[in-house]
């Protein structure tokens, strides 16, 4: 399809248009819970979950040279019982159709090595809560663009509002290869924005899966929740 669009105003258990991997599930309240919590709602360590849209997305077309522009928006919350020990983060990603959850923890389920590799064919916008020095993370919670590597090509400081709902808008303008991500906390009226040039057609396969991936830390205390409340996406191949 040259155009794809979908809207989840809330999620439903056994949602046919979602592929859930790892620990991801939809709660009876209609929340996409990417990582495990115990019976008291406390997040658990060493949890990894992903959720992608059921249909592949046509991001570019080799026959015509057309590349898709897209816009996606979602609302999510990260809650950590102890803000001093939080890990590891959530990402929106585009990856090959056969992509499976990779290493958890700081790799966020998207990569399995600190070394970048073009065979990943993956682009992600990470909302990273833990400084993995081996990935050259900055020493604060941050938003980053990941292109075939967990080591971001560009980051911006993000002040995590613990337990507050964040509204994210990610857009890609294929005409100028501009990727933009913004995060707003309506409750505190704070906002963060990151933009860079990324040539998706040189990184991604023609057809991709789009969705979310999240992971908690391996150590007992390095935990947080990763809950997505709503998600919309629209893409269109354009010259």
Curated annotation (Swiss-Prot):
The keyword RNA-binding does not apply. Mn(2+) binds at residues 126, 128, 137, 142. Disulfide bonds: none annotated. Ca(2+) binds at residues 128, 132, 137. One of its GO terms (molecular function) is calcium ion binding. GO terms for cellular component: protein-containing complex. Keywords: Antimicrobial, Calcium, Fungicide, Lectin, Manganese, Metal-binding. One of its GO terms (biological process) is killing of cells of another organism. D-glucose binds at residues 88, 106, 217-218. Tetramer consisting of heterodimers of alpha and beta chains. Belongs to the leguminous lectin family. Galactose-binding lectin. Agglutinates human erythrocytes, and requires Ca(2+) and Mn(2+) ions for full agglutinating activity. Has antifungal activity against Fusarium sp., A.niger and A.flavus. This is Seed lectin beta chain. It comes from Spatholobus parviflorus.
